[in-house]
From Swiss-Prot:
Keywords noted in UniProt: Allosteric enzyme, Lyase, Nucleotide-binding, Pyridoxal phosphate
Pathway: Amino-acid degradation; L-threonine degradation via propanoate pathway; propanoate from L-threonine: step 1/4
N6-(pyridoxal phosphate)lysine: residues carrying this PTM: 58
Cofactor(s) the protein needs: pyridoxal 5'-phosphate
PANTHER family listed in its UniProt record: L-THREONINE DEHYDRATASE CATABOLIC TDCB, THREONINE DEHYDRATASE, MITOCHONDRIAL-RELATED
Name listed for the protein in its UniProt record: L-threonine dehydratase catabolic TdcB
Length: 329
């Protein structure tokens, strides 16, 4: 028996998304980490979405959204904007579904992510220097070509797709006490929160953002949507200064807490994952583990079972070298 909330996404939407995704994506592993368990004085399990197709969780929401389009909408083609992971998720989903896709990426997007997006099938348009520039170009393409826009996070189908991670967690570790989730625009934590809380509302869902960019945390703690960004962050995949309207509504209702981590804590988390768990992750993917190592979650995690979401692993090797100190930054 599931609990139903009056929110834009329900548990039934996530179950439908799981059915659409069956055979199309991986059910990612979630092993117990001895290192993190010993450090945190609890049982810590790592959910490896960095091992997902395209290297991040984003394909879940992208595929669910695209497969939900009508035949007429699919024939129009789609357009998305992203600096990396959403772009790759949309591009591969288009290839699997036979949809013509176009992705607008900022000129400064990592070359490896641009190349991967092209390889998966979509036409890449490099435009502008930031999200505002790319979204303006997307609006132009929608108007000129009639394509369907695929949002990166603030969409019910996208949120439901990301929520399938929550279902997998409950299948593999039904007695989990806490789920720790990175936050950018909020699609991932919103979907996971709906899935988890609909099955067992006593499980804590806790978000993590960078001190440098934390629009969702600022909104969550102030009680209204607001913007926060001081400078860039190693967690560039979560460099979103303002949360979505839908994601904020869900987070405000269902998420238990949001904590902030420093750039040094993110860096140390990435290094720990490489050295101790042999896992390469991007900065955004290391946010949840950064919070675990920081001590800021000790009140929740000690002597309890906790899942930490490793949301993505798309990072250039040169960046890994800089972070681990093999070459100068």
């Amino acid at each position: 028996m599931h609990i139903t909330y009056d929110l834009p996404v329900a548990i039934d939407d996530i179950i439908e998304a799981k059915q659409r995704l069956a055979g199309r994506i991986y059910k990612t592993g979630m092993p117990r980490s001895n290192y993190f368990s010993e450090r945190c004085k609890g049982e810590i399990f790592l959910k490896f979405e960095n091992m997902q197709r395209t290297g991040s969780f984003k394909i879940r929401g992208a595929f669910n959204k695209l497969s939900s389009l009508t035949d007429a909408e699919k024939r129009k083609g789609v357009v998305a904007c992203s600096a990396g992971n959403h772009a790759q998720g949309v591009s591969l989903s288009c290839a699997m579904l036979g949809i013509d896709g176009k992705v607008v990426m900022p000129k400064g997007a990592p070359k490896s992510k641009v190349a991967a997006t092209c390889d998966y099938s979509a036409e890449v348009v490099l435009h502008g220097d930031n999200f505002n520039d790319t979204i303006a170009k997307v609006s132009e393409i929608v108007e000129m070509e009639g394509r369907i826009f695929i949002p990166p996070y603030d969409d019910p189908k996208v949120i439901a797709g990301q929520g399938t991670i929550g279902l997998e967690i409950m299948e593999d570790l039904y007695d989990v006490d806490n789920v720790i989730v990175p936050i950018g625009g909020g699609g991932l934590i919103a979907g996971i929160a709906v899935a988890i809380k609909s099955i067992n509302p006593t499980i804590r869902v806790i978000g993590v953002q960078s001190e440098n960019v934390h629009g969702m945390a600022a909104s969550f703690h102030s009680g209204e949507i607001t913007t926060h960004r001081t400078t860039g962050t190693l967690a560039d995949g979560c460099d979103v200064s303002r949360p979505g309207n839908l994601t904020y509504e869900i987070v405000r209702e269902l998420v238990d807490d949001i904590v902030l981590v420093s750039e040094d804590e993110i860096r140390n988390s990435m290094i720990a994952l490489i050295q101790r768990n042999k896992v390469v992750t991007e900065g955004a993917g290391a946010l949840a583990c950064a919070a675990l190592l920081s001590g800021k979650l000790d009140q929740y995690i000690q002597n309890r079972k906790t899942v930490s979401i490793i949301s993505g692993g798309n990072i250039d090797l040169s960046r890994v070298s800089q972070i681990t100190g093999f070459v100068d930054a």
